[in-house]
């Protein structure tokens, strides 16, 4: 039943909605430029809390961080290291050792600095390593591996440096998104899980698999 009171409420709602507009940053604001909705058409659910994941970096020592990232390129005669690569790839790898070590060192230094930062400002010195971000990195990596039928005997046709270049290019594309720029925590997770040592030596990803992974 419509009464004078419900009619008044309806009029206020209509007049209020007339003042709403979607700005260029995709936020919904009123006539006083106050944010009513952070994303136009959003369902109000915080997507950052969709995936609860482990970030082992916070409990890693400097030596463990080096072990996680540094490619064992000092000994090219090590069968464990070389047998996974195709012969043409191995030739390219030998020529790229210096550049590979240089880029790995840059990432290691970055992650050591990030480790100290997130312990202090994200976990606030608490003994915790769970984070909530909308991308399940480990699950995506395993899905791509399964979809491409990669196993422990698969041959790798991409060098660590070439993989790093694809990984860096992938992050730059994500970073170029104007409205949804990645957070520092996303960057840490991205470079923690997407390492050539894990993808190439452990998971045995080939070039096609790495490209598919980056696109996802």
What kind of feature is each model-predicted range?
Residues 1-66, 196-216:
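Long insertion/accessory domains within large nucleic-acid-processing enzymes
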Residues 1, 55, 59-216:
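Core mixed alpha/beta domains of very large multi-subunit molecular machines
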């Amino acid at each position: 039943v419509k009464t004078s009171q419900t009619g008044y409420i309806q009029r206020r709602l209509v007049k209020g909605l007339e003042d709403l507009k979607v700005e260029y940053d995709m936020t919904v604001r009123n006539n006083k430029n106050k944010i009513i909705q952070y994303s136009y058409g959003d369902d109000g659910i915080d997507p950052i809390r969709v995936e609860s994941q482990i970030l082992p970096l916070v409990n890693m020592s400097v030596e463990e961080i080096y072990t996680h990232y540094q490619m064992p390129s000092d000994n090219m005669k090590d069968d464990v290291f070389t047998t996974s690569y195709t012969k043409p790839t191995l030739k390219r790898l030998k020529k790229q050792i210096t550049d590979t070590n240089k880029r790995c060192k840059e990432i290691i230094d970055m992650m050591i600095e990030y480790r100290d930062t997130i312990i202090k400002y994200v976990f606030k010195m608490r003994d915790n390593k769970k984070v909530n971000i909308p991308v399940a990195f480990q699950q995506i990596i395993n899905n791509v591996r399964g979809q491409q039928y990669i196993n422990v005997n698969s041959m790798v046709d991409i060098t660590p440096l070439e993989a790093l270049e694809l990984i860096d290019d992938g992050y730059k594309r994500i970073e170029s998104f104007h409205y949804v720029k990645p957070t520092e925590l996303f960057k840490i997770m991205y470079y923690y899980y997407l390492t050539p040592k894990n993808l190439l030596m452990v998971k045995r990803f080939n070039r096609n698999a790495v490209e598919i992974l980056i696109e996802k």
